[in-house]
């Protein structure tokens, strides 16, 4: 009898967390919150790398057909705005001057695009993130997308451009912020 009670208590101690944990995990995990956390991290990383290139080198490009460093930043800003508009938010999108050459204007465009994205993501719920996004000409190769997929896609696109920016910095003798050591 003593062993049966001990066994019952042991089972209770071991099984109860398993019964409660999924419910707690569901409360803690959220599509919208996960995407917002990733978006915020990406903004911080991109603002640092964008500012890392000396102003007199913003026009640098490794080969003639490529975008220069400043254009890469503006390309990210424009893509952020264009893709986030697909999430049907009431937020007013910033206007990106794709011909900007001033460091201050370029960095402001990038920051504004991420701030716009932050507001758009915050306006979503897990349910709206699973709804279809507005269609664009890009759907011909990607197919219809959920709003969550659009956010994921634009972040993937940004990481691609980030990788190119790392090379631009290194070709100019600049260590990317993420690689710097104290």
Q: How would you name each of these model-derived features?
A:
Residues 9-23:
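Bacterial N-terminal signal peptides
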Residues 36-40, 44-47, 57-96, 135-182:
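Short, contiguous alpha-helical
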Residues 1-7:
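N-terminal secretory signal peptides that target proteins for export/translocation
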Residues 45, 49-50, 84, 116, ...:
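Well-ordered alpha-helical scaffold segments within catalytic/enzyme domains
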């Amino acid at each position: 009898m003593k062993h049966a009670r001990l066994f019952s208590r042991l089972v209770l101690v071991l099984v109860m967390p398993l019964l409660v944990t999924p419910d707690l995990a569901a409360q803690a995990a959220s599509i919208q919150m996960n995407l917002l956390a990733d978006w915020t991290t990406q903004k911080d990383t991109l603002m640092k790398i964008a500012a890392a290139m000396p102003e007199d080198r913003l026009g640098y490009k490794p080969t003639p057909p490529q975008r220069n460093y400043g254009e890469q930043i503006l390309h990210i800003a424009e893509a952020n705005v264009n893709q986030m508009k697909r999430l049907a938010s009431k937020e007013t999108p910033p206007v990106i001057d794709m011909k900007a050459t001033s460091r201050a204007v370029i960095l402001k465009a990038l920051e504004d695009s991420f701030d716009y994205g932050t507001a758009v993501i915050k306006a979503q719920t897990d349910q709206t993130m699973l709804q279809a996004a507005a269609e664009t000409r890009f759907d011909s190769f990607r197919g219809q997308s959920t709003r969550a997929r659009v956010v994921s896609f634009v972040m993937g696109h940004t990481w691609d451009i980030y990788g190119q920016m790392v090379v631009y910095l290194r070709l100019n003798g600049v260590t990317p912020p993420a690689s710097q050591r104290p």
